[in-house]
Amino acid sequence: MKVIIVEDEFLAQQELSWLIKEHSQMEIVGTFDDGLDVLKFLQHNRVDAIFLDINIPSLDGVLLAQNISQFAHKPFIVFITAWKEHAVEAFELEAFDYILKPYQESRITGMLQKLEAAWQQQQTSSTPAATVTRENDTINLVKDERIIVTPINDIYYAEAHEKMTFVYTRRESYVMPMNITEFCSKLPPSHFFRCHRSFCVNLNKIREIEPWFNNTYILRLKDLDFEVPVSRSKVKEFRQLMHL
């Protein structure tokens, strides 16, 4: 797995380089302190991941990531920065992770393990666009200006709140900066169903289906004390999905 480091502080660059070599099998093929130099390098070289600071000369890390996102081969991007206010932008760019300085060594090592696993899955998957959700498929969620790499199967349901979407797992909740239609489009339709204009539910997390008023249903979920409604307009499709 080939990676580059983009960091204009020499000591920070050296520390990150040491951690990568010490705790992973990744090959560092370049270190840079200037955004434009990175773009020039990537025009002729392919890498699998980029560890990226934001406050760098010539072209800041966010703009650099926006340019890289247009490439046919999109490397994983891990932001490592002191600027916490760019976490939402990083999510929109589908960054793999967003780590704030100063960081704990354990935070870096945990990220490296997940990154190598994601890369291995990318290499071995012959059907990357398949609708079947594997146990280790993940999605990036935002919490407290941090990106949390979350297994898709951990999501129980999502609920619309105006232009935002609240996402719920068994123990956590997340606020996503997008409407529920956009968020649901990121989920595999074989496992998630838009049961109501305000709700999307993980079909695998349904514990009980109770008939409700006007031929609708209430869904009770495993492990959560919460009921998700099925609207009248979605009843027919829901019955077909659940073989009712």
Curated annotation (Swiss-Prot):
Cellular compartment(s): Cytoplasm
Record-annotated HTH LytTR-type domain positions: 139-244
Sites of 4-aspartylphosphate modification: 53
Entry keywords, A to Z: Cytoplasm, DNA-binding, Phosphoprotein, Transcription, Transcription regulation, Two-component regulatory system
PROSITE patterns the record matches: HTH_LYTTR (PS50930), RESPONSE_REGULATORY (PS50110)
Any coiled-coil regions, as ranges: none
Gene3D superfamilies hit by this protein: 2.20.25.10, 2.40.50.40, 3.40.50.2300
Protein modification: Phosphorylated by YpdA.
Function: Member of the two-component regulatory system YpdA/YpdB, which is part of a nutrient-sensing regulatory network composed of YpdA/YpdB, the high-affinity pyruvate signaling system BtsS/BtsR and their respective target proteins, YhjX and BtsT. YpdB regulates expression of yhjX by binding to its promoter region. Activation of the YpdA/YpdB signaling cascade also promotes BtsS/BtsR-mediated btsT expression.
Name of this protein: Transcriptional regulatory protein YpdB
Gene name per UniProt: ypdB
